[in-house]
Structure formats: C-alpha cells, structure tokens
C-alpha cells in the first residue's frame, strides 16, 4: 500500500510458566544480589575499587535494568585502562521463603548475581613518529617521541608526555644571517576520567561521563626572522550526553605566555617599523604577551545535522586584577 498508514498494535503478554506442568504466574522481576568484579589478566584488577563502583550503573539490591547494563558497558569503555568488559548474570537457586505465619513455602527466586569480567590494557606505551616536511619548497624533517601511561594512579588516569623536534632549511631569504629553522617542544597532559571539582555530590559524579584535563607545554622556535618562546597551561572539563547527542567543553583557565627574546633588525625594518607595511595586528603578533582566557563550547551532532557554539572571554579577569593592584600603563596602553 502506497503512502503512510497508521495502525493500532496490541501486545498480549502471556504469563510465565516454569514448565508445562507449572501454573501460570506473573513474570518475576529479578533483583541483583551481588556484583562481583573479576580479572581476566591476573589475580587482581589494577583499578581502585571506588573506580569500579563509579563505572557500574547496576546496583546491588535493585531490579535488573537493561539501560543500566548498557550504561555500565559504556562507562567501562570510556576508561583508557580497560581493554574490554564482559558482564554475565547467574540466577540464584530457588530457596524457601518464610510467610507471615511462619510457614515455609517454595517460591521462584527473584535474585541473580552479576559478574563483571575486566581485561586491562598495558599501562605504558612509547611511540616514535618521524616526519618529512616540504614548506613552499623548503625541505625539513621532524620527529616526535611520546610516552603514555593509561593507569597512572590506578584510576584510569592517562598521562602523556610528548617531545618533538623539527628542522627546516629555508632558502630565498636575503639580509638574514641564519637560514635555518629549528623548533623544539615538550607537552604534557594528564586526563582524569571524572569531574575533579569541589562541592559535587557523589551521585552527580557517577551520573556524568566527564573528563578533567590538565595540560602544559613549552615551545621554542628559532627562525631567521625571530626567536619565539611559548608557554601554555590549561585546566578544562569535557563531558557528553550521548542520548541527546551533546558534547560540552568548559575551559576553566587557559594561560598563554609568549616571549620574543630576539627579532632580526632586517625583519623589524622591513615589516614592523616600515610605515607602508606597519599595522597593529602584525606588530601584536611579535610582542611579549600574557593571555588568560576562559571558554565554553557546545556541540550537537545526530549524524545528519551538526551545530557548534563557542564562547570565550579573554583578558577581563587579568585586567581587573591589574587595575586593583595599580599596575603601571606603558605608552602602548598595556599594563606592566
């Protein structure tokens, strides 16, 4: 039949029979008696017990829930230290129950035990990645060495440290003593698979699929035109709501310090001090800067439509502090 049609659907749920000779009774609602954590790798699981509890949406003494089972799988999949998880249930054998008048009667057990088997990843890995570069005909090479620990404090915290070096032979520059570009950087990142913040209840932390991230980096660039040093550090939160296709990011604090120890006189004369080429944006990029910002981001994606919103505030808090302490203002209007 072409087109859309509405139909009425009626579901008749037959009562439960243990066997062909047993009477029909209401379907029992099973409760979880015990939750057991088992290791597939060794005698013990290399995760703190509280971490296991926070990742388990199933609860002892509560009815079985398919939604809670799926959330438990999802929560363990988020942990970088966990390789895979298998959850099985075993029904508690039928037992005698005591009625109100003290008589014993046989009844169908409504309890089952939950067994969560966990296999963990190797905690530490080292990766080396070489690169070849070609920037407008200038050939170069780069290499990075990354160390990762996926279970730093036995809570699936992930620590990564990356060392990187790059070299490029620059051609076609006139009036500069050095014709090579070198860059060295080190970056460290520590990710906690939970909210790290005061005044949050335990139930709130267990419900949220959040990450807390601390990062710091140092970058050294030596170009024929200038030398630049950049230090950055940030503390941010990320969490998701899969049912609503939402992802959130909150940058609580993001600090960036840019230091220019040396600028070539040729570069100053041709670009920064030349009246024809001089502009505020160009000069701003080659000054010593200290930037503090906060930011909030929201993204939505359902596989068809995608929306992203970002809001940032930079310098307001730092400006207020400098005014409160009476920092001096230089000729360019900057507080020092």
Residue ranges, per PLM feature:
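Secondary-structure transition/capping motifs at alpha-helix termini
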Residues: 79-83, 118-124, 149-158, 197-198, ...
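Generic, well-ordered alpha-helical scaffold segments in large soluble proteins
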Residues: 55-58, 72-75, 79, 146, ...
